[in-house]
Amino acid sequence: MTAQLFLTYLVFVAVAVIGISAAYLPRRTTFAIMAGLAIWLVYVGLFSSLGYMRDVSLRPPGIVWVVGPVVLFVVFVARSNIGAGVAAAIPLWLILGLESFRIGVELLIHRLWEDGLVPKLLTYAGGNVDMFVGLSAPIMAWIATRGRLGLRLAMGWNVLGLLSLANVAASSMLTGPLKLISTEVPNVAMGIFPYTFIPGFLAPLAVTLHVLAIRAIAARYRDTRSPASGISALTN
């Protein structure tokens, strides 16, 4: 039952990403996102369903074959003109508000803990504050439209959101297939289908949204230094 709920939510998030891309980005960019997302989801799904994700005998370990490309993609979004274009095209409030999808992810991770598939450390009951990032996302989406102070607060919130993700990622890696630390139950979920889509898609999506938001905020904050451009920038 948990797997069915997870896959349903995964499809919902993926469709939302494609829908927003189609609404705000050029057709060619939207097609590239759709094709790239489809290929990546198939890759992660096959990789995990065949057992490679939890195979610690691989060199490098199976998790690297998923996390490695994700890191390269995030760097591309952070540094490329394409990333800047996407950040400029999608309204800032929408980029920030989309982070609320993390509420559903955290509820599902809590369910996995109840099923004995992840340690309590990865849940909001165990001190994971990522749920609060998701809950505050709609509020921050509104605050970001309130002038330069709002932009500054949104920038700080994004930094805190990235730190929260880094904490969860580190905890997941340490308790994952490599078993670098011991917990009351091992983190087996992240190495099996379909839950490998948490490190393989959902967590990277959260990071990507933060990176896009930071790029958008930086651009808008620069614009507000000019009175004429500041008015138009803050209406987005």
Predicted regions and their residues:
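Hydrophobic transmembrane alpha-helical segments in integral membrane proteins
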Residues: 1-15, 55-67, 196
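Hydrophobic cores of alpha-helical transmembrane segments in multi-pass inner/ER membrane proteins
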Residues: 9-19, 67-80, 132-141, 197-215
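Membrane-interface capping segments at transmembrane-helix boundaries
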Residues: 24-27, 79-85, 212-228
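Membrane-interfacial loop-to-transmembrane alpha-helix junctions, especially the N-terminal start
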Residues: 26-37, 90-93, 150-156
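A glycine-rich, hydrophobic loop/mini-helix early in the fold
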Residues: 39-111
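Membrane-proximal helix-loop-helix units in multi-pass membrane proteins
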Residues: 83-150
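Hydrophobic alpha-helical membrane-insertion segments
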Residues: 154-170
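Short, membrane-exposed interhelical loops at transmembrane-helix boundaries
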Residues: 176-197
